[in-house]
Amino acid sequence: MMKPFDTHAHIYDKRFDADREQVMEASFRELDYIVCPSENLESSQKTIELVKSYPRLYGAVGIHPHEACHATEDILASIADLAEHNHKIVAIGEIGLDYYYFYSDKETQQEWFHRQVALAKDMDLPVIIHDRDAHGDVVRILKEHKDTRLRGILHCFSGSLETALELIKLGFYISFAGPLVFPKSVHLKRVAKEIPLDKILIETDSPYLTPPPHRGERNTPLNVIYVAEEIAHIKGLSVEDVIFQTRANALGIYQIEE
């Protein structure tokens, strides 16, 4: 039977320092692939080292919107160099806009978002998008970059059905994480029901956003199964069908050959 693909897990996070190897061994007994996105140059370098250790772990490098205030030309050049010289780096990310915390101001966030989307296109890589309370500007900026090379993933989707459909038209996949499983996530469940399965990905965003029944605990890639089960329930499909299609979708967008 096909095993799930967790498209977004921060394996380098310090919360895994004490037992990372055990977590990865347990995860790869139940999952086929994991992608580890980065937040800044330091985590990008950690991701590079991690993907060397696990054959089915792939990575992404980039500057998170929280880190945009620390971004420089040299940092971006270093990230580009990491992506160019490591075949297991399959995307630029996670990048985007966060208007909830505002660790960086809007103008700075947007500047580095633009720069990294352009970088991804130059390198013919997909982008992994972080969008918190910034749906309008995220869609606007992506539309400004629209061409045949623009593609990617809207990670941990939290927007409306209309936003999801606009992103799909732009060549993006919609990725659902633990919040889809929360009983109160009525609008998210509607989005998952209405958009086609061939445009859906699943993720954990480990160690964050742990789904029921493990709320309050550290999240791990093993919990991606709960997201798959929720999509199956919402769409009236088998869990096997959801795992098969989301896995195929992830292999396609990340251009991973089996």
Model-identified regions with their sequence ranges:
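Mid-domain alpha/beta scaffold segments of enzyme catalytic cores
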Residues: 1-258
